Amino acid sequence: MAETQVLLETYQGQGNNNATNIEATKAAIKKMLVRIERFQTRVRKHIDENYVDFMPNHTSPDIFLEKSSALGDEISDLLATVGNEGLSVLSDASVELAALSRDLREKLFGLRVSEHILKLDDLFQCVEEAKSTKDCLVVLDLMGRLRSLIYGEGTSDDISPDVERIFQSLECYESIKVKYHVQAHLLQQNLQERFDRLVQLSCKSFPTSKCVTLLISKDEALLQDIVIALFQESYNPTKLCAFLLENCIEPLIQKPVSVEYNVNAKDGTHIQLTLSYSIKEPDTSSLLRPNYKDVFEHFRLLLKTLCGINSSLNGTQHVFTVIGDHVKERMLQLLLDECLIRVPETMDEYNSSTLCEDVAEFEHQLVDTFLINPELDTTLTEFTKQFDTYYRNRLSERVLATAREIIQRDLQDMTLVAPSNLSANVASDPLLFPRCMVSKSAQVDFVKLMERVVRQPDKAAEGTPDPLGGVIGLLLDAYINEVPKVHKKLLKSIPQQSALFYNNCMYLTHWVAQHTKDNIDGFPSLVKILQSTGNKHLRVQVSYQESILMDIMSSFEFENPHTLGTAPLRLVRQCLRQLELLKNVWQQVPAENVYNNSFCELLQAFINELVQRVFSLRDISATMASELSDLIDVVLEKASILFHDKNDVVHVRSWLKLQQLKIMMNASLKEFSELWCDGVGPLTANYHADEIKHLIRALFQDTDRRAKAITQIV
C-alpha cells in the first residue's frame, strides 16, 4: 500500500514540498500502472491459451482472481484518496499526473473485464470438478451461473453494462459461448444416459404380439436428482411420451393386455412392469376390448410403476404434468370413445352399475398424480354428468345412435323446401307447407330415418310388443331436447340458427301430421311440443333482437332543447342497420309470414320507443320539429325496404302512428284541429286527447290561439 501512503502525504504537506510530493505521486501511479500491465499480460496469456489458441494450460484461475481482487482494491483506495477534487488540483499542478490518474481508472475498468473472464474460467473448472463427483444438481447450478455471466441474464454479480459490453466484443467471447454450449450439450447427454440407466423402457415386437417392459430404479434420491436436472435442462420429453402413449396407454384401453407387476425386480433394486398384447387386427374388435375396470386397474399399475420419476419441478408442475400435456388429450378421448361408451343396456345392469363412481375415483387418481388438470380436463366429469343420457340413448339401440349423430350436424347446412308454396298458396290451403329453408340434417337425414322406421315390416309375432314401438316418439323427443343443448350457443348468438330450428320443428310437425295413419304414439302431444319448442326458440331470438334495439335506444337523449343534434339520428340509423343485418341473414330462411310477423314485432317495439322519446319533450322548437320530421322520414324510408313487399310494412301496428307524428311535426294549430276533428278525425285512431294536447303545448307558444286549439281537443 506504499502508493496510497504517498498520496496521503501529498495532501498533508502541500507547502514547499508540493513539487516533490507530486513527483512522488506520479512515481507511485506509474509503478501501479506497470504492475497492472504485467498482471494483464499474464491474464491475457491465460485467456488466449484457454479460449483463443486452445493450448494446454493447467494454471488455476483462482490465483489470478485473488491477485485481480487485491489490485482492484489498491487502485480503488488510490483513486479514492486522490478523489475528483484532488485530481483537479493535481491537474493544475501537473498535466502528466492527471493523465496518469485517468489511465489508472481505465486500467481499473480493464481489470474488471479481466476479472469477469476469470470468474467464467473458474466456473468452467468448477463444472469439471462437479462432473467428476457426478453431482448433477451442482453442475446444473453452475451452468446456470455461467449462462448468467455470459449472456447477462439476471446475474447476481454487480457487473456494469460497460463491462458486459466490452466483454461481449472480445475475441474470446465466441469461444466462451461455444465452450458453454458444448458443456450444456454434454450435461444434457450425460443426464439422458443416466436417466436411461435408471428408467429402462424397452419394447420387443413379434409377428403377432408385442412385449413392453418398464424397469424403474428404486433409488429414489438419485432418480429424483437426475429427473429434476434433466427436465430443467431444456429436456424434450416427446420421445418418452410417445413411447408411453403408443406402447402402454393406447393398448391398455384398446386391447386385452397381460400385465405383470414385480416390485422386487433385479434383486429388489428395481420395479418392473411387463405388458404383453396382440398386435393383430381382430375381426370383431369390440368384443375383444377390455372391461373398463381392467383398464382402470392396469392404469393404476402403470402410474404406480412410474411414480418414482414424478418429481416436483416447481411449485405448480410435476413430471407427470409435462407428460400429461403430451398424452392426456388422446388418452381421455380413447377412454370416452372406446372404453366408457359401453354403458349398461338393461335396467338391471343400470341399477347394479358402479360406472359413475369408478370413473370419478379414477379421475381423482389422475388428478392426484398431476396427469390431468381438474379445471381444464373435464372429459371424465362430463361423462358422469351425462351418464343417464347415454343410458337412455342406449335403450333405443342403433337407430337412436344414428339420430344423435344427425343431431350433431350443423343446422346451417340448409336446403330450400316447397319452393312453389308461396304465402298466397298457403293462405288458401293450410295443409301446404310454406316455402322456407330447412336444415339438411332435419329435412333429409332425420326424416329419412323416421321413414325407414315406419316402413319396417311387422315381423313380430302376434301378441308380442313391437321392438321399434314408440321409436318415432323417442326420435322426435330426442330432437326436441338435444338440439337446443348441442347448439345452445349458436341458437342464442346466430339469428339464422334459431330461424332454421323453428323451420325444422315446423317441418317435422308437418311430417307427423302426414303420417297419422302410421299410429305414431303420442301424436297430439308431439305436434304441440314440436310447435311450442320451435316457437320458443324463435321467440327467444326475436326478444334478443328487440333487446339489442332497446339497448341502442337507451342512449337516445335530447341534449339541446333547441336542436336535435347528431346523436339521435345516429342511434336511429344504428337500429335500422341492426334490422337490416337481421334481414340479410333471415330474408330467405323463414316462411314469408313468419319473417313479416317477426319484423313487424321488432319495428313495433322500435317505433313505440321512438314515439315515447318524442313525447318526453316538454318544449319542441321549430328547428327541432323540422329535424324530428326528417328523422322520422329516415325511419319511414328504411323500414319499408325490410320486407319482401314494401306494402307489408303497414301491418306494423304503430306505422300509421309514426306517419301521423311526422305530419304533426309540420302541422299548424288549425291542422291539428282538423286532424282531430272533434274526436272523429284520423288522429283518434292512434292518439289520446292528452297526447295531442301535450304535443300542441310542446310545439306552440302559449297564446290565445293555442289555448283555443287545446280546448277543441276533447
From Swiss-Prot:
GO terms for cellular component: cytoplasm; nucleus; RZZ complex. GO terms for biological process: cell division; endoplasmic reticulum to Golgi vesicle-mediated transport; meiotic cell cycle; mitotic spindle assembly checkpoint signaling. Its main location: cytoplasm. Keywords: Cell cycle, Cell division, Centromere, Chromosome, Cytoplasm, Kinetochore, Meiosis, Mitosis, Nucleus. Pfam families: ZW10_C, ZW10_C2, Zw10_middle, Zw10_N. The keyword Chloroplast does not apply. It is found in: Cytoplasm; Nucleus; Chromosome, Centromere, Kinetochore. The keyword Cell cycle applies. Belongs to the ZW10 family. Required for accurate chromosome segregation. PANTHER family: CENTROMERE/KINETOCHORE PROTEIN ZW10, CENTROMERE_KINETOCHORE PROTEIN ZW10 HOMOLOG. This is Centromere/kinetochore protein zw10. It comes from Drosophila grimshawi (Hawaiian fruit fly). The lineage of its organism: Eukaryota, Metazoa, Ecdysozoa, Arthropoda, Hexapoda. The gene is mit(1)15.
